[in-house]
């Protein structure tokens, strides 16, 4: 699931004017729908910072498993906590983990990929072998090893997911950058005496940004799935901090009695992942020069 998206070699073009981009974007159904779903999740997380219908941390056993009502719009869970409040606070936890984890993967992955492409030789070989080694440890396995050392928690899931993001972004960056290094304008820059670092910053990185932006949306979706899985297994976000994965864990023993307790967090995860994937598809179509000319 974490393999990089397939995009043809980057084409050096002038940046698309912002007005042209947004005019085309608002006509692209995948981009609009994906953006709307993603903004819905982001808005839920932001709202939870200042308001929730009830405290997501307050336990009221007397109110457990209540059906939807005017007081509790989606009912309550087995601890008497308001479902809407848990979903809002869970969105905050999920986005926090996803943003930090993807930032870790992006920082190290892009840096290593650019270095491998610029230096070549033994430097490239070492970086790519390190990438292969890291790729052998999925997020769940990394979280288990980290939990054995420092204990389970949000930090454990962030580090584990972040490490798992690195090899994918390293490979994508290196492959995309190699295509740019072979182009005439880069060869001309080298002939003019520009160093590898300057060429990387001025020519290579700007020409692969669109590919990286699209891939980040895919990696963010994978991070949400990984965070939910780790929290469900008890390795990620710990009580009393709400998490969609933790909500699924709490609901598994009540599937026949109250199946909606599992449906709500499952739907939240599905909406988040679907929105990011649609957004990524839309950005790919809008930012790829070949696809842009075809539309």
Model-inferred region functions:
Residues 135, 146-149, 161, 176-177, ...:
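Glycine-rich helix-loop "coupling/hinge" segments at transmembrane-helix boundaries
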Residues 3-4, 8, 36, 40-79, ...:
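Hydrophobic alpha-helical transmembrane segments of membrane transport/permease proteins
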Residues 1-39, 278-295:
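Transmembrane alpha-helical segments of polytopic membrane transport and secretion proteins
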Residues 35, 83-115:
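Transmembrane alpha-helix signature in integral membrane proteins
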Residues 163-164, 210-220, 259-295:
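C-terminal transmembrane helix and the adjacent membrane-cytosol boundary/short C-terminal tail
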């Amino acid at each position: 699931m974490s393999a990089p998206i397939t995009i043809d070699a980057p084409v050096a073009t002038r940046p698309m004017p912002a007005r042209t981009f947004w005019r085309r974007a608002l006509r692209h159904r995948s981009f609009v729908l994906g953006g709307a779903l993603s903004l819905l999740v982001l808005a839920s997380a932001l709202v939870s910072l200042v308001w929730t219908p009830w405290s997501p941390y307050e336990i009221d056993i007397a109110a457990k498993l209540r059906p939807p009502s005017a007081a509790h719009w989606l009912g309550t869970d087995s601890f008497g906590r308001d479902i809407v409040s848990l979903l809002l606070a869970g969105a905050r936890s999920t986005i926090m983990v996803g943003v930090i984890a993807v930032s870790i993967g992006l920082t190290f992955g892009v840096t290593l990929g650019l270095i491998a492409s610029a230096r070549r030789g033994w430097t490239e070989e070492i970086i790519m072998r390190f990438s292969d080694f890291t790729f052998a440890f999925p997020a769940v396995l990394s979280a288990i090893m980290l939990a054995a050392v420092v204990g389970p928690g949000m930090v454990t899931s962030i580090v584990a997911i972040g490490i798992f993001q690195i090899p994918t972004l390293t490979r994508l960056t290196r492959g995309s950058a190699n295509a740019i290094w072979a182009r005439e304008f880069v060869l001309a820059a080298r002939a003019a005496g520009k160093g590898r670092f300057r060429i990387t910053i001025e020519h290579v990185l700007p020409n692969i940004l669109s590919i990286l932006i699209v891939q980040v949306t895919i990696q963010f979706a994978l991070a949400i799935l990984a965070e939910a899985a780790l929290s469900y297994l008890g390795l990620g976000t710990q009580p009393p901090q709400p998490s969609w994965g933790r909500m699924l864990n709490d609901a598994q023993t009540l599937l026949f009695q109250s199946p909606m307790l599992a449906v709500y967090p499952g739907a939240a995860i599905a909406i988040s992942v679907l929105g990011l994937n649609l957004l990524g598809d839309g950005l790919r179509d809008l930012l790829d020069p070949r696809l842009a000319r075809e539309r």
